[in-house]
Amino acid sequence: MENETHYAEAVIDNGAFGTRTIRFETGRLAKQAAGSAVAYLDDDTMVLSATTASKNPKDQLDFFPLTVDVEERMYAAGKIPGSFFRREGRPSEDAILTCRLIDRPLRPSFKKGLRNEIQVVATIMALNPDHLYDVVAINAASASTQLAGLPFSGPYGGVRVALIRGQWVAFPTHTELEDAVFDMVVAGRVLEDGDVAIMMVEAEATEKTVQLVKDGAEAPTEEVVAAGLDAAKPFIKVLCKAQADLAAKAAKPTGEFPVPSSTTRTTSEALSAAVRPELSAALTIAGKQDREAELDRVKALAAEKLLPEFEGREKEISAAYRPWPSSSSAERVIKEKKRIDGRGVTDIRTLAAEVEAIPRVHGSALFERGETQILGVTTLNMLRMEQQLDTLSPVTRKPYMHNYNFPPISVGETGRVGSPKRREIGHGALAERAIVPVLPTREEFPYAIRQVSEALGSNGSTSMGSVCASTMSLLNAGVPLKAPVAGIAMGLISQEINGETHYVALTDILGAEDAFGDMDFKVAGTKEFVTALQLDTKLDGIPASVLAAALKQARDARLHILDVMMEAIDTPDEMSPNAPRIITVKIPVDKIGEVIGPKRQMINQIQEDTGAEITIEDDGTIYIGAADGPAAEAARATINGIANPTSPEVGERILGSVVKTTTFGAFVSLLPGKDGLLHISQIRKLAGGKRVENVEDVLGVGQKVQVEIAEIDSRGKLSLIPVIEGEEAASDEKKDDAEQ
């Protein structure tokens, strides 16, 4: 029946952590789409995915026009959007990152050469606040596409696995992730022999990883991460089987989707005879721009030589030439273990690292790897400047923000600049995840941190270059990182020889190697463990054993890069004089109202008097930020006087306010309810030692004056002396004499 609803179910057994049920449904919602499926997680979280395709191919395109969109509906979590118009606007960062998670295993699963427009829209319709919807959306997108009658080699399954108390747990909740050492999203497909080929990995250590490892948990080393990939396989099999069961009941037959005609053997042979020597020579040029210029010349030469014979078949010549540089480079790597720029498969390009690359900023660093150049810049501010989030996630604020910019100048081109594209958001998020596990806690370093990575030159893995530049920039800004982090991009070349697929892993890939290679595998970490990992592949899948070997190869490269970075900076520098100074004070919760005062009068007065900025948390923690240390300390002293009153001591210096003048001196308010007398004989010091007839000639009511408590009599009366710049040493000598 056309309107019949079909179901399939996958039960995930997590042992002591219980079970998760992923249920697929089709035939009830979005019935006019080519394929639609609803995925439920424990009947509590619901994602609707719909796949549609254009009727005719876009023959003028030289790429596959696949679009993935994720629509977060705030009603899913029982919220009303916080925007002015109270409706959803541009996609959140979470939605954009989920789009990329869906796209990465989906794209290589389509028939090669397909030019029909394909759109997949995943709508988050219901969400348990303790669930993460991204992996549910990955499976929903696979299921809806499998049902759509498209040339698609699915299904594939996506699962999040987290290492919690020594066990890999599938589909963990936010609550469970608080105890996780490592968190990993893995997508893969089941092969004919029953094994699972990995198609996509997105992984990270957590904020608590360092502490958990100190407490005895197993560190997420390369071997542990490889074990996590193996642990994900049984879960992926269960998910793929459920989708296959659903497709057996409801999938449309695969339609006719013609692809551009492949090049004839005659064209390939003619092209080989015409320019093979020139092409081979061009592919040995190390410099990116010189190599690309020579490849353009060879392409023009090929057209010039072949057009008389293939008149009117310019597109065919162009199509024949397009894969040649890639296939020739790959063939050289497989046979000779030599790469475009002459390096061996494990060699790293020349590295350079320096800090304090630009003036006045709070922290900066420049990292170069070959032609890839990244500038990292750190800015520190009060915690009230942390990013406020209005999303479906239970996380509402983010004190560490990592922004990645990729202007067209980085590749020597013209182009649009402005708001970040999906790629820039994704690269920034990857670099952020690599750094977060080693950041200090709010209590250890009460600052909002904005890290900006400027890609000033690009020829391979600017995202991993951003990790390296950010580590050095943060250290230069004085951020006490738990450990330095570096990153490296790995590539993979595969070729079938005598029916067997051979793989060669490449360390530190170039942009061209990323383009013609079969895998982009980015790994970041400390000397001890992996902090972030990302895998993209153009193949239907990669054996887990190949990935495990690439992980070990990446570790050797990472350690070498860390050594170079540590030569530039290995410990946190002193904070820049341009950075704000932030200190904390803890007060009783019942004293918060007194510090704020009626209509915020008290807190506003403290901020006005000292120039400090004050943020008060609900638990009584107060963050005080100022341009310099003395201003912050003055604010802290005032707050302590209100909420944590202590008896003043002789020798204590306080910035006070004149509250009354008399013929014999001025009364200065030091703390709420505590005044002291600055005698007229002492006021003359403020007038350069001249005789003072009227106190008002030197001090007025409301004027600020730095004073020191000189004496406290038996009745608690305070006698003050002024603190004069240049005379502080003399004051210290008097204090020593008095003590003797």
Swiss-Prot record:
It is found in: Cytoplasm. Residues 580-639 form the KH domain. PROSITE patterns: KH_TYPE_1 (PS50084), S1 (PS50126). Keywords: Cytoplasm, Magnesium, Metal-binding, Nucleotidyltransferase, RNA-binding, Transferase. Pfam families: KH_1, PNPase, RNase_PH, S1. It is an enzyme of class 2 (transferase). Residues 651-723 form the S1 motif domain. One of its GO terms (biological process) is RNA processing. Its cofactor is Mg(2+). GO terms for molecular function: 3'-5'-RNA exonuclease activity; magnesium ion binding; polyribonucleotide nucleotidyltransferase activity; RNA binding. It catalyses: RNA(n+1) + phosphate = RNA(n) + a ribonucleoside 5'-diphosphate. One of its GO terms (cellular component) is cytosol. Its EC number is 2.7.7.8. Coiled coil: none annotated. Mg(2+) binds at residues 514, 520. Its main location: cytoplasm. Involved in mRNA degradation. Catalyzes the phosphorolysis of single-stranded polyribonucleotides processively in the 3'- to 5'-direction. Homotrimer. NCBIfam families: polynuc_phos, pppGpp_PNP, PRK11824.1. Belongs to the polyribonucleotide nucleotidyltransferase family. This is Polyribonucleotide nucleotidyltransferase. It comes from Streptomyces antibioticus.
